[in-house]
């Protein structure tokens, strides 16, 4: 088995621990994945998220810096690093990261919510209100998109059932 395969296995073990909120073992597995594959950006991002859940924002920031160093267009890494900066009281850096994440992905509702929360905490109520409006708008769009996708699937399913029923009728 190659190092990449082993790294992937360790990553999957780590994510299973993350889902079960076992962040210590999660971090151990993800660290092993990173040793096996130092360019495994998703392992760094996931380990950073686990550090964030353990309230270790400095370690989280270090991992998110690695991800951003590997891929400066990773909106999620900027968002998560912004959350970590906010936990350390570095609110200007947090806002910068939230803004950068939104430059990269303008429909990233979670970032609008995070930025709204921080702006509200800082007394920037107009900006916070504007961001909450965006969260609401994006939520409505997502619900509509989901509904449309579900309707398309249902229409296709009904067409398949119709063809199947026609085939059965022809066989009789």
Feature locations, PLM:
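Alpha-helical tetratricopeptide repeat
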Residues: 1-172
């Amino acid at each position: 088995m190659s190092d990449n395969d082993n790294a992937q296995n360790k990553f999957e073990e780590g994510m299973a621990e993350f889902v079960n909120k076992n962040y210590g073992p999660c971090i151990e597995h993800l660290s092993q994945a990173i040793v096996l594959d130092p360019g495994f950006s998703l392992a760094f991002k996931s380990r950073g998220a686990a550090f964030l859940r353990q309230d270790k924002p400095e370690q989280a920031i270090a991992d998110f810096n690695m991800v951003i160093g590997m891929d400066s267009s990773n909106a999620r890494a900027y968002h998560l690093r912004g959350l970590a900066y906010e936990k350390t009281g570095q609110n200007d850096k947090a806002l910068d990261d939230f803004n950068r994440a939104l430059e990269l992905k303008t429909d990233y509702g979670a970032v609008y919510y995070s930025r709204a929360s921080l702006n509200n905490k800082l007394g920037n109520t107009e900006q916070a209100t504007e961001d909450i409006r965006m969260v609401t708008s994006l939520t409505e769009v997502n619900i509509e998109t989901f509904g449309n996708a579900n309707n398309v699937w249902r229409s296709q399913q009904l067409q398949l059932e119709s063809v199947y029923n026609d085939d059965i009728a022809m066989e009789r």
